[in-house]
C-alpha cells in the first residue's frame, strides 16, 4: 500500500497557492483532479492550503476529485474517514494542524475537519482507460504516476488531461517529469523551475 505524508511536497503546494490560485479563485465552481492520490494526504494537503488562502466563502466552491488505481481496494475508505496516524501528519505546521485535525478514538490517530473532508470525493480509476472524471477542470495534478508509463502512454494521458481543462486551466506534475515533445505545445510553462503548465489559449 502506498504510504504518503501530509505536506510532503511543500514547494508544489506553494506554487499552486501563488501562481495557480490567483487565476482560478474567481470562478463560480473550481473543480480539481488529483490523479494518483494514494491514501489521500496529497489532495487533503492541497485542500488545506486552498482553505487557508481562500477563506471559507470561496473555498465552498472547490471540489477536489481524487482518483487512484488503488489495487488494494482500501484507499476509498481511508480517504472518506479522513483518519490518519501520527507519522503521516507530523510534517504539518502546528497552527494548521490545530485548526484542521482533532484526536480520534484510536491512539495517535487524528481526524480531519469535516470542512476539509467534504470537499474531496474519491473514485477508483485507471488513468490508462483515458476516461476523465469530468470535463470542466481548473487544475489537474498528477504526480509520481506518469513515470510508471511508457512514453506513448504518457502522451495519451496528458492529451486527455489537456482535453478536460477549461480555457486557461493548469496541469501540475512532479519536477522531474518533463512534458513529452508531442504535447509540449499544448501548454505554456508558468514556472521555469517547476512543472506547472497552463493550457494555451485556443487549444481545445
Predicted regions, residues:
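Extended basic-aromatic, gly/pro-enriched interface segments that bind polyanionic ligands
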Residues: 56, 60-141, 145-149, 153, ...
Amino acid at each position: 500500500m502506498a504510504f504518503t505524508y501530509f505536506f510532503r511536497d511543500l514547494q508544489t503546494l506553494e506554487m499552486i497557492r501563488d501562481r495557480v490560485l490567483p487565476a482560478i479563485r474567481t470562478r463560480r465552481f473550481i473543480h480539481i483532479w488529483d490523479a494518483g492520490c494514494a491514501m489521500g494526504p496529497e489532495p487533503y494537503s492541497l485542500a488545506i492550503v486552498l482553505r487557508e488562502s481562500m477563506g471559507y466563502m470561496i473555498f465552498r466552491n472547490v471540489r477536489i476529485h481524487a482518483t487512484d488505481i488503488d489495487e488494494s481496494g482500501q484507499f476509498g475508505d481511508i480517504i472518506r474517514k479522513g483518519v490518519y496516524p501520527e507519522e503521516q501528519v507530523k510534517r504539518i505546521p502546528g497552527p494548521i494542524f490545530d485548526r484542521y485535525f482533532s484526536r480520534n478514538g484510536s491512539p495517535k490517530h487524528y481526524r480531519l475537519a469535516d470542512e476539509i473532508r467534504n470537499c474531496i470525493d474519491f473514485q477508483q480509476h485507471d488513468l490508462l482507460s483515458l476516461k476523465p472524471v469530468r470535463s470542466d477542470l481548473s487544475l489537474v495534478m498528477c504526480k509520481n504516476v506518469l513515470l510508471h508509463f511508457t512514453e506513448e502512454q504518457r502522451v495519451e494521458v496528458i492529451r486527455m488531461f489537456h482535453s478536460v481543462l477549461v480555457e486557461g486551466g493548469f496541469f501540475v506534475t512532479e519536477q522531474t517529469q518533463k512534458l513529452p515533445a508531442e504535447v509540449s505545445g499544448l501548454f505554456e510553462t508558468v514556472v521555469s523551475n517547476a512543472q506547472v503548465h497552463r493550457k494555451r489559449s485556443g487549444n481545445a
